[in-house]
């Protein structure tokens, strides 16, 4: 069965392309009525320095106080930058500041955010959609498309135009310190299908994307925020694996690609040269060989992976030379603009090179509606960012991701009338999962154990739990990057192995790689994986355990010899008599 999975996912990819292609807006670089006229009129009004500044996007927070906000407004007014990237803060504060910043900008700003799981990645009081690893388990990719559209709506409510998402890195290294849960998984076909659905949802809603991190950051063991990763793979390997999702999404009209800070000798042998600064990678490979016509966007230019070997603004200059259109988050934007201007005078950069990028940026602004800019209306904004239909979709996404491994024998046989032990591990207080499940199975007892509990307490609990007819064990871990480990003490790991040998259903509320660090989990009667430890996941599992919904998720990654990519039962429950109260 496993030998046929790549073929099945390829067929799935073709089907999703066919399904979505008829629904998409044309990319910004395709002909549009009135676009050339507006672009030319704006372009002609810009002086040489202002044209350079259009390529630079600056950082903006909404939680750093008035002095900081005034400094950003001054930089926008004086330097004439092309856009900004919002980070931490609140939605109302961001909307008010966006209106203020736009009011002093010569050309309407292209407003971006790194919002892989929605704007809650940066803003409080908003909906957090599932991580991409969770989405990788979903079999109905239309749900991911709908999520992309919902996130697109949120962007438009906040006057934003560009999402630095989706991540299309193939996470084939479980110890990856920077991607991991941000990836759809370790299968190139699944990553591509999911990435395409997310991209289409955003672009159909009128939001630009930036698929990342080109040419593929999934098999690294160095965080490019801190140092320069080196990818020592052949061109053939890169072409067949890492580049695959980028190639396919570019064919389908990706509006932007973010270039990673990595040294890749097979693509450019220059020592210590990040891919962001490589003309062979950005211009020859991305724009030439892959035919990309959208916005080439650097990863943050303040990261150590790019400035370590090219300090004092040299990285900014080289990023322009390499062929990037948008230079985001320079260490010093004013200095960078001056250095690029100097590089033009000395012949390192041609004026035509700048003009190409500026016109492309203006085309993207036109596509995003900035030719007809309107300030954000903050009336009922917080309510509109948390509508019932969006919250419902968020729960449906989690519902669709839950994966049943090993067997569904006890799931089908679970009897709400029998004495049931409901155990949560790795916590210090009763979980919502336990409280909700007890409402449905009143003939139950709740137990918990912290991740540093004593062996004496565990032995006493084990003796008590053995008196029960059936056991539901929940393993809780909030870590995003477990790297194939479970950070429980040794006695608790032994305790898990002993509990698994009882008549036990094990529920893993954690990143799937955590399973590799859970001893004896394969001895459980059934294993449920949720990918995250949040309220949505706990609600989903309660519904599955009590026969209220099926479980259809598949593992998006290979964990170990027991559990591999694509594993997961299609579990359809038989209706169970629910004795307790209904909380849904």
Protein language model features and the residues they cover:
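Loop/turn elements at helix/coil->beta-strand transitions in domains of secreted/extracellular proteins
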Residues: 48-54, 79-84, 105-110, 156-162, ...
């Amino acid at each position: 069965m496993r030998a046929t999975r790549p073929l099945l996912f390829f067929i799935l990819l073709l089907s999703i392309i066919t399904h979505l292609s008829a629904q998409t807006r044309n990319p910004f670089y395709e002909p549009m009525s009135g676009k050339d006229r507006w672009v030319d009129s704006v372009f002609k009004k810009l002086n040489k320095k202002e044209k350079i500044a259009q390529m630079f996007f600056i950082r903006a927070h909404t939680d750093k106080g008035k002095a900081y906000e005034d400094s950003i407004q001054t930089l926008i007014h004086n330097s004439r930058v092309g856009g900004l990237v919002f980070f931490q803060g609140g939605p109302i504060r961001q909307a008010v500041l966006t209106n203020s910043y736009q009011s002093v900008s010569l050309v309407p700003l292209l407003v971006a955010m790194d919002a892989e799981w929605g704007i809650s990645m940066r803003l409080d009081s908003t909906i957090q959609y599932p991580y991409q690893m969770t989405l990788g388990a979903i079999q109905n990719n239309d749900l991911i498309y709908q999520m992309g559209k919902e996130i697109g709506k949120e962007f438009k409510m906040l006057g934003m135009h560009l999402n630095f998402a989706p991540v299309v890195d193939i996470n084939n290294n479980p110890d990856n310190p920077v991607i991991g849960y941000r990836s759809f998984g370790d299968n190139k076909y699944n990553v591509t299908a999911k990435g395409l659905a997310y991209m289409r949802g955003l672009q159909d809603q009128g939001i630009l994307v930036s698929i990342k991190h080109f040419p593929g950051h999934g098999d690294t063991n160095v965080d490019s925020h801190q140092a320069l990763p080196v990818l020592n793979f052949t061109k053939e390997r890169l072409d067949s694996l890492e580049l695959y999702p980028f190639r396919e999404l570019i064919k389908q009209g990706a509006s932007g690609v973010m270039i990673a800070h990595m040294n890749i000798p097979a693509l450019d042998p220059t020592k210590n040269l990040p891919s962001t600064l490589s003309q062979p990678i950005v211009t020859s490979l991305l724009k030439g060989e892959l035919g990309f016509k959208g916005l080439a966007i650097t990863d943050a230019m303040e990261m150590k992976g790019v400035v370590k070997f090219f300090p004092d603004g040299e990285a900014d200059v080289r990023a322009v030379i390499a062929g990037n259109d948008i230079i985001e988050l320079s260490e010093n934007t004013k200095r960078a603009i001056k250095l690029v201007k100097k590089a033009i005078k000395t012949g390192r950069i041609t004026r035509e090179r700048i003009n190409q990028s500026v016109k492309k940026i203006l085309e993207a602004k036109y596509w995003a509606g900035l030719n007809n800019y309107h300030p954000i209306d903050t009336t009922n904004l917080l309510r509109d960012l948390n509508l019932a239909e969006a919250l419902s979709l968020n729960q449906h996404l989690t519902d669709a991701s839950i994966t049943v491994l090993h067997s569904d024998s006890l799931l089908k046989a679970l009897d709400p009338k029998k004495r049931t032990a409901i155990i949560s591990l790795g916590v210090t207080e009763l979980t919502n999962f336990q409280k909700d499940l007890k409402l449905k199975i009143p003939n139950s007892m709740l137990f918990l154990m912290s991740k540093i509990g004593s062996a004496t307490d565990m032995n006493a609990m084990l003796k008590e739990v053995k008196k029960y007819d059936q056991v539901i064990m929940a393993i809780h871990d909030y870590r995003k990057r477990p790297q194939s480990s479970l950070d429980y003490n040794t006695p608790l790991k032994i305790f898990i192995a002993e509990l698994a040998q009882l008549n036990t259903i094990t529920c893993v509320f954690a990143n799937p790689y955590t399973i590799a660090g859970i001893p004896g989990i394969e001895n459980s009667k059934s294993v449920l994986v949720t990918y995250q430890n949040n309220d949505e996941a706990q609600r989903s599992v309660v519904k599955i355990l009590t026969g209220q919904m099926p479980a259809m998720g598949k593992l998006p990654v290979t964990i170990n010899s027991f559990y591999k990519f694509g594993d997961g039962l299609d579990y359809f429950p038989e209706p169970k008599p629910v004795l307790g109260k209904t909380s849904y």
